[in-house]
Amino acid sequence: SYVITTPKMWVMPYGCGEQNMVNFAPNIFIME
């Protein structure tokens, strides 16, 4: 479940959630 909460943590402070999601998405899938 931490994979679902983690994106919110770095999406809010960075502000550019869309760009970060594209860069972090591959890493999130690897963590699974």
Curated annotation (Swiss-Prot):
Record keywords: Bait region, Disulfide bond, Protease inhibitor, Secreted, Serine protease inhibitor, Thioester bond
Keyword Cell cycle among UniProt keywords: no
Keyword Secreted: yes
Subcellular location: Secreted
Disulfide-bonded cysteines: none
Similarity remark: Belongs to the protease inhibitor I39 (alpha-2-macroglobulin) family.
Chain's role: Is able to inhibit all four classes of proteinases by a unique 'trapping' mechanism. This protein has a peptide stretch, called the 'bait region' which contains specific cleavage sites for different proteinases. When a proteinase cleaves the bait region, a conformational change is induced in the protein which traps the proteinase. The entrapped enzyme remains active against low molecular weight substrates (activity against high molecular weight substrates is greatly reduced).
Official protein name in the record: Alpha-2-macroglobulin homolog
